[in-house]
Amino acid sequence: MTDYQSKYSLYKRKYLSLKQKQNGGNNTADNTADNIDPIVKKFVDSIKDAKPVYEVTPEEARKNLNSIQSDQSYKTTVDMENVVVNDKNVNATIIRPKGNRDRLPVVFYVHGAGWVMGGLQTHGRFVSEIVNKANVTVIFVNYSLAPEKKFPTQIVECYDALVYFYSNAQRYNLDFNNIIVVGDSVGGNMATVLAMLTREKTGPRFKYQILLYPVISAAMNTQSYQTFENGPWLSKKSMEWFYEQYTEPNQNLMIPSISPINATDRSIQYLPPTLLVVDENDVLRDEGEAYAHRLSNLGVPTKSVRVLGTIHDFMLLNPLVKSPATKLTLEIVVNEIKRITTPNKN
């Protein structure tokens, strides 16, 4: 058992023991209110009267998430370089440790937030922590948002950016022999689709993929979708709305580039080793774990972690930065990046 697995197991045991004690020895696994950390509960309570995304416009949804993320007090100092990818009008940002121009390992980061929201304003703190704690360069793709641009635009733009930086690795001093793809939520969806595309198109290969509470299937028929249909935070109706914004009305949502769980065995067998993280109180929990099982069963070295006491987007949300789940999972992610990108540490 690795060090992070030991720490996670210890946290898991302590948290369950605490909940059992509070509930007279009964573990109320189906009671979401009893299964979230106090910091998380405070955040959930603070937004309980806010309109859900499916009752506002995409622009309002973006403003609302930006407002939640407005506390930048935890943002760490980094250097950023904005790049326009060839003639594709795709914007990306290279993020490095402050003052460090060394040829560092690369994390190709694909952000989440429902394909509709998100960018450096929402993800800046999180990716900056990865940059500084793992000592890597992050390539952050500012892909076009839905519904202004529909599927597959976002995936195409991310792939174009990947190929561009691979072709210009020397110019930007990037170690493309040491590249990991990381994505959260819908970014996790696109990250694993990108990993499949690199094989199909013989593009640059990822050494590893880290998928954080990823969107894996549009079927929306798992037990966790039933248990957490109304949240907290992410609900079934919200996911339905996100898919509506992302795709055209007659789009088949079951194709692998939208629902990666449906990829062929061959496509999955060639995926890179994987760390997949899900959270306890999340409609996406079960599909993420089902994907981890499928990868593992098809021979892909896979680590799957379920983090207790928290909600979807917990790594992203600035109000949750001090929660035990966020701190521990950041440590897991950073340690895994270091293990993969540091010579003789694999």
UniProtKB/Swiss-Prot annotation:
EC number annotated for this UniProt entry: 3.-.-.-
Keywords: Hydrolase, Virion
Record has Hydrolase as a keyword: yes
Any one of the GO CC terms: virion component
Subcellular location field: Virion
Top-level taxon in the UniProt lineage: Viruses
Signal peptide per UniProt: none
InterPro entries hit by this protein: AB_hydrolase_3, AB_hydrolase_fold, GDXG_lipolytic_enzyme
Keyword Hydrolase part of the UniProt annotation: yes
GO molecular function: hydrolase activity
PANTHER family, A to Z: AB HYDROLASE SUPERFAMILY PROTEIN C4A8.06C, ALPHA_BETA HYDROLASE FOLD-3 DOMAIN-CONTAINING PROTEIN-RELATED
Assigned protein family: Belongs to the AB hydrolase 3 family.
Identification of the protein by name: Putative alpha/beta hydrolase R526
Source lineage: Viruses, Varidnaviria, Bamfordvirae, Nucleocytoviricota, Megaviricetes
